[in-house]
Amino acid sequence: MRLILLGPPGAGKGTQAGLLTKKHGIPQLSTGDMLRAAVAQQSEIGKRAKAVMDAGQLVSDEIVNQIVSERIDAPDCANGFILDGYPRTVPQAQALSQMLSGKGLKLDAVIELKVDENALVKRMESRVAETIAKGGQVRSDDNPEAFRKRLVEYREKTAPLSSYYAGTGELRIINGMAPVEEVTAEIERILVPA
């Protein structure tokens, strides 16, 4: 199973990817996690990514495409993967298509979680409060100003992916405002039709 989860920041892509990973035994490939790992390691790419992420902007396609291509080649991706937060732009989607084709692979589905932006701000605030309550570290881009920038960036650069994947016939749209369990059940219906 090779799947892309689309939706704005805070839509629940990471939550759904985590649930699908547990059920199907395939890895969740979160570019955010991969980029944060590079930042934590303070590599050259990590330092460049940190400056961009702290400003609430998206990391360049070149860096992200390279990270994703290398990750897809890992042995744990042999039976599939769930892409969370990638592709973010139509050029990245085109690069992914070429990348997968070159590896003899194709996507099984692209699922978009549709959500209300006002509700996203509340979700972000809840995520921050929950992280703090658990004694965890809050992401540097989980603040209202950076979050609003991420939403604007999403509308400008990532939202066009809906049209792109609708054109390829791979797009399936789900109400991301539904309870987590209902969203998961709807994704499962798409992946394993009755």
Curated annotation (Swiss-Prot):
Listed GO CC annotations: cytoplasm
Region (LID): 126-142
Signal peptide: none
EC number(s) on file: 2.7.4.3
Pfam families attached to this UniProt entry: ADK (PF00406)
Gene Ontology molecular function, alphabetical: adenylate kinase activity; ATP binding
Binding-site residues, ATP: 10-15, 127, 178
GO biological process: AMP salvage
Pathway(s) served: Purine metabolism; AMP biosynthesis via salvage pathway; AMP from ADP: step 1/1
Keywords: ATP-binding, Cytoplasm, Kinase, Nucleotide biosynthesis, Nucleotide-binding, Transferase
Highest taxon of the lineage: Bacteria
Gene3D superfamilies from the UniProt entry: P-loop containing nucleotide triphosphate hydrolases
Function recorded in the entry: Catalyzes the reversible transfer of the terminal phosphate group between ATP and AMP. Plays an important role in cellular energy homeostasis and in adenine nucleotide metabolism.
UniProt note: domains: Consists of three domains, a large central CORE domain and two small peripheral domains, NMPbind and LID, which undergo movements during catalysis. The LID domain closes over the site of phosphoryl transfer upon ATP binding. Assembling and dissambling the active center during each catalytic cycle provides an effective means to prevent ATP hydrolysis.
HAMAP family linked: Adenylate_kinase_Adk (MF_00235)
Protein name according to UniProt: Adenylate kinase
Gene for this chain: adk
